[in-house]
Design a protein with these regions (language model features):
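Divalent metal-dependent phosphoesterase catalytic cores across multiple superfamilies
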Residues: 18-185
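N-terminal Sec signal peptide cleavage junction
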Residues: 13-16
Length: 185
């Protein structure tokens, strides 16, 4: 019975209702277009690391060509690795590249380009080939809709080997609808 009700509600949800939910949340920042989900990196090894982003097209496209670049400097004066990744709606327009030919224990900068626009610049680091110590930051549940999380900026300024996020970041409910009114938070 519950499954039938859920399917009925989803089938009868109109585009107007879906647009309203997006407008209420207000999470789109025009300056990030079409990279609204930002950039991320992970799974570092001594000579490679995975970089990730998602492109959000204004309309459904059969495929999107996404250029990516990796550099040792923020200004990308010298590109040490680059390529093109073809994404599509079956992948939800996500991009996941396993960048290789990197040096151990080095900081790298990366960015993406699609639909005539560039993403923000990401920073990543490969694992050292001789680990005598490891500097890790651990962060936990963060509700993007409920705060600014300035502490993340401080973490970005630290000389860390890794940041591990142990919780959720985006929750599935309307903005300002988390508390039940008792706590008023």
């Amino acid at each position: 019975v519950y499954l039938f009700c859920a399917i009925f509600i989803l089938i009868n949800c109109t585009n107007k209702e879906l647009t309203f939910i997006e407008d209420v949340d207000g999470l789109k920042v025009d300056s990030m277009d079409p990279f609204y989900h930002g950039v991320a990196s992970g799974d570092p090894l001594e000579n490679k690391v995975i970089i990730w982003t998602r492109v959000t097209p204004e309309k459904t496209l059969s495929e999107i060509s996404v250029k990516w670049k990796m550099s040792e400097s923020k200004d990308f004066n010298e590109i040490i690795n680059e390529g093109v990744f073809i994404t599509n709606s079956k992948r939800d327009y996500t991009v996941k590249v396993d960048v290789d030919k990197l040096s151990p224990g080095k900081i790298y900068f990366y960015k993406f380009e699609a639909l005539g626009k560039e993403s923000m610049v990401g920073r990543t680091k490969t694992i050292s080939d001789s680990i005598s110590s490891l500097k890790i930051a651990a962060i936990s549940c963060s509700d993007y809709q409920r705060g600014f999380f300035n502490a993340y900026g401080s973490l970005a300024d630290e000389d860390l080997d890794a940041v591990i996020h142990l919780g959720d970041y985006i929750y599935e409910y309307k903005s300002r609808d988390y508390s039940n009114g008792i706590f008023k938070r």
